[in-house]
Every structure is written in C-alpha cells, then in structure tokens.
Amino acid sequence: MNDKETDKEADTMEGFDRGEDIAVMEPLQVSDGSPHQGALTELAVDLAAKSAGFRRSLPDSVVNALADLVRAMNCYYSNLIEGHDTHPVDIERAMQNDYSDNPRKRDLQLEARAHVTVQKWIDEDGLAGRAATLEGICEIHKRFGELLPDELLRVQDPQTGERIRVEPGTLRRRDVIVGDHLAVSPGAVPRFLGRFEQVFSRLGKAQTIASAAAAHHRLLWIHPFLDGNGRVARLMSYAMLRDALDTGGIWSIARGLARQEAQYKRQLIACDQPRRGDLDGRGSRSEAALAEFTRFFLQTCIRARAPTSL
C-alpha cells in the first residue's frame, strides 16, 4: 500500500491507549457561525449544480464508458500521490491479466488492479450509505489489501528494521508518526472512529458535500491503519461524493489532488495544527485551516468534474 511518506512506528507496545479525549479532534465540521461558511456553502451549491448538469447531459452509454475511464484515471493519480508512477498502459494491461515479468512492475500492476476493482465495487453500490462508517472504512481497506501482493503489505519499523505485515481491514495495534504528527494511540482508534461515524455517516446530501473535506482530513488524522490510509481516505471521499452528488462515477477528485499534490499535503498538515486563538473556532484544531482545506477541496472537485483524458 505504501503511503508516500511511509508510516513510522513510534512504539512497539501493541494496543495501548493513552486515554486521549475525542475532543482533541474537534471541530469535525466548519461551524454555522464561521465567517467562512457563506463562501463554502456557495461552492458546495455550485459543485452540486455543475455535477448534476454534467451527469444529465450524457446518455447512459457514454456515462458507463466514461466511468470505466475514470476508474483507471483515479487509480493512476492516486498511485502518483503514493509515489507509484504506474503507466496507464500498464494499468490497462493489468485489467486484462497481462502482467510484466519485472517483479516490481508486476506488483504495481496488481496494486492498480486492486484500486480499479475496489472503485468498481463502490460504483456498483457496494458501499452505499456506509462510506463514513467504521465498517465501511475497514471494508475498503480489506478489499484493497486482499488483492495486493505480499511485498506491498509490508512496512518497515525505522527503529528496528523489522518488516511488519499490514493486515487488510484490521485497525492498527501500534503507534505511528507521520511527518510531525503523532496519531492517536492504537487503543483510542475505535473511540475516535466512533465519533467520526457519529458525525459523518448521518448527514444529508448537502451536508455531506460540504463536509467531505473535513471527513477526508480527520480520517487521515486518526490514521486507523498501519498503512494505506491515504488510499482509503480518497476512496471514502469518492464514495461520499458519489452518493451525495449522484455522479454516476464519471468524475473523481484524485486527479485534481495529484496535480496539486504539494498544496494538498500542505493543507492537510495545516489542518493538524491547534486552534490559533479565540477567533479560530471553539475546538482543539484550527477551524480556519479546516475551512481553507474545504475551500481547496470543493474547488478541486469543481475543476475535476469533467475529465477528458489522463
């Protein structure tokens, strides 16, 4: 799976809980009273209108063909974000069971096939209504991981050199540090995912569109799996927006995120930061940073809604 910045082990004691309060993850949404809310609502409405118009403008036969293209495109760009440059031709060959004799290239082809397969399952309503649930998030990870070669299910402890196997669909039992972010302790992960599900799985369509960016970041912030969190977050976001916007699977945000990768990652890091004083919301994390990421995310969706080529 290999997120581009490999998850780093911070402690080998498995399953411990530091007792973190779920309040340290707040806010989970940009508040109604935020000075940013008006502009974000306008972007969400614009996205909904343009997505619906684009979907209605195409006959079903074109929608089906375009959905196949988007799955390959989404896979290609999601791979780029992970640091895996799998050529579109190799992705197409993988879908035809035509694999390279080069072991590394073959592994990346299998990874690409896994991504396309899981997204097709989402497009066929396999995750309908469950994208932001603990069950759904674990199922994305499980379905993806079970299709990967063993080599891509291994992460290395930078302190001991130990090669640790990632168990598909299983929440991590170890501490991890990604960049400067120490994720919540492994014993706290179910508690934080419970709060995540409580907030994001019960939203109406309009609220889902407006909150998809926040869900994307907060899942990465929790970092529920030993590896593969970036892919799961992008597939979850794809599924949430597909349900809320009835996209027909004909556009995806992954291309836009990959083309602005540096900004995407800067925005995610900014959302990790604590509140910047009394005018920055009422939660532990910066509401202004979350609002800025939401703006970036929605604008990226608007630009990405009409894919024509890789």
Model-identified regions with their sequence ranges:
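FIC/Doc superfamily catalytic core
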Residues: 1-310
